[in-house]
Amino acid sequence: MTDTLASLAYLAGKPTAQAKIKAKPEHFQVREDLGFEFTGSGEHLMVRIRKTGENTSFVANELAKACGVKSKDVSWAGLKDRHAVTEQWLSVHLPKAETPDFSAFLAQYPSIEILATARHNKKLRPGDLVGNDFVVTLSEVSDVDDVLKRLETVAKLGVPNYFGNQRFGNNGNNLQEAKRWGRDNVRSRNQNQRSLYLSAARSWIFNLIVSARLEQSLFDKVLLGDILFKGDEQLLVSAENHADLQSQYDAGDLVISGALAGDNALPTQDDALALEQVFLDAEPDLMALIRGNRMRHDRRAIALKPANLSWQVDGNNIILTFSLDAGSFATSIIRELVQEIAFEREF
């Protein structure tokens, strides 16, 4: 598979150590955190599943059959990796109060477990989660000491908050199609397809902006005209507050943001605007798609700092534990630590 991110900069240089990722399903464990409680009643049956070596859409389709409903009646907050052991909630539109008998379903699919059920008054929609907890094993690590040094840097500074390869499709196909749609002014009623390509377009431009800040040693430097996050508040950097905001950033109180391009003007100014505008101008096909669909500009943190990061060494394996907010990619953490060893999976 092509690494769409291969040309993007690293925080501490490209890793020299190599390791296998997802050598076994249990080497990549994910637990979803919705961040809210269920109402206890309502038309939607919430089903907590643990799946091993299966993708979310397949499990959802099979669960729909087990419940006697259509596939469109089962939804989720986020798609989870196939080559992994993952826990997440699925919602089933099932107005009747009875919970189906899942025994035949579970007997048919030993790779799927049902951990809990509950009732709720709303269906799950994509994005209805606050984050995910991860336990990731890097196996057959070629240079454990180098990875441990890099982990210390990650704990202190975080990593570039890149959108991962998953966002761009197999071999970057979603990104290439996004460029074609923009170039040829393609119009489609397929909302899912359009959403995939728009997401790939904005994500790629954002990645280029973050990479440029790294290459220009501006990843941790506040620029004139930057938009900074302070909790839910956004602050514009001016000549008057520049020094003060840099100090607050250095103290860990502020976060530098990058552009998620839209059809409206960038809100950044001065040096930050000049830096970001270059990459919007460099991708006319992607911008044509974004503007043609009237996407509105948004902002995203350029640095990803994993919460609750810890690690332990087991021979030449390193086991990582961390939590990420929704929309962040565990692969962005791994990318800063090791180069992935290609191998044939047996699952």
UniProtKB/Swiss-Prot annotation:
It holds the Pfam family TruD. Keywords: Isomerase, tRNA processing. Responsible for synthesis of pseudouridine from uracil-13 in transfer RNAs. One of its GO terms (cellular component) is cytosol. This is tRNA pseudouridine synthase D. It comes from Vibrio vulnificus (strain YJ016). Its EC number is 5.4.99.27. The keyword tRNA processing applies. It catalyses: uridine(13) in tRNA = pseudouridine(13) in tRNA. Residues 158-304 form the TRUD domain. The active site is at residue 81. NCBIfam families: PRK00984.1-4, tRNA_TruD_broad. The keyword Isomerase applies. Coiled coil: none annotated.
